[in-house]
């Protein structure tokens, strides 16, 4: 008997109860079934998850990352990817890249059946998520998440910071 993870996850065999019900805490239109794939298969440095999103819903909300690159691959169904101000129809077979510090993005299920997609990216202990629609950012750390109102945030140059000129 081995304690090694099975490197093959048969996603077609997954049942709804194998996933985690997920709602983004800042988006009332968020609803998804969230299936972790990379950890059960033994990956530690990258994450890959499968999301099943019902019609009219989205898994996350308009956001971008400052530390982690992200991607999505549509497996079933159809939806609309919002990337910046652009709204683009997506369907099975489409790959979408979300580069570091790129445009804010989200994927909405605009179809009539569940939208199933893989999403993943880098797995770092820290990340910063920016939510432009609500003017907030989240700092993801190993011990929790800090939610910051961007209206209260101040930006300093390196010269100001190191000179202690924070007034």
Where are these regions (language model features)?
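A short, N-terminal "cap"/entry segment at the start of jelly-roll beta-barrel domains
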Residues: 1-45, 130-167
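Conserved short histidine dyad/triad with adjacent acidic residue
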Residues: 30-34, 49-65, 100
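Ligand-binding loop in jelly-roll beta-barrel domains
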Residues: 42, 80, 100-127
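Short, conserved beta-strand element in jelly-roll/cupin
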Residues: 50-54, 64-82, 120-124
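Short hydrophobic/aromatic patches on the structural cores and recognition surfaces of FHA
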Residues: 77, 93, 107
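Short acidic-glycine-tyrosine-enriched beta hairpin
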Residues: 85-100
């Amino acid at each position: 008997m081995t304690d090694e993870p099975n490197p093959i996850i048969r996603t077609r065999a997954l049942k709804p109860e194998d996933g985690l019900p997920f709602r983004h805490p800042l988006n009332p239109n968020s609803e998804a079934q969230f299936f972790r794939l990379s950890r059960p298969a033994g990956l530690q440095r990258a994450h890959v998850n499968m999301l099943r999103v019902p019609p009219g819903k989205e898994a996350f909300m308009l956001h971008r990352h400052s530390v982690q690159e992200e991607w999505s691959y549509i497996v079933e169904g159809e939806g609309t990817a919002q990337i910046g101000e652009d709204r683009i129809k997506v369907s099975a077979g489409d790959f979408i890249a979300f580069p570091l510090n790129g445009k804010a993005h989200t994927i909405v299920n605009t179809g009539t059946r569940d939208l199933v997609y893989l999403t993943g990216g880098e797995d770092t202990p820290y990340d910063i998520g920016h939510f432009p629609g609500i003017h907030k950012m989240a700092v993801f750390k190993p011990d929790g998440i800090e939610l910051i109102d961007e209206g209260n945030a101040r930006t300093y140059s390196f010269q100001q910071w190191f000179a202690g000129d924070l007034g």
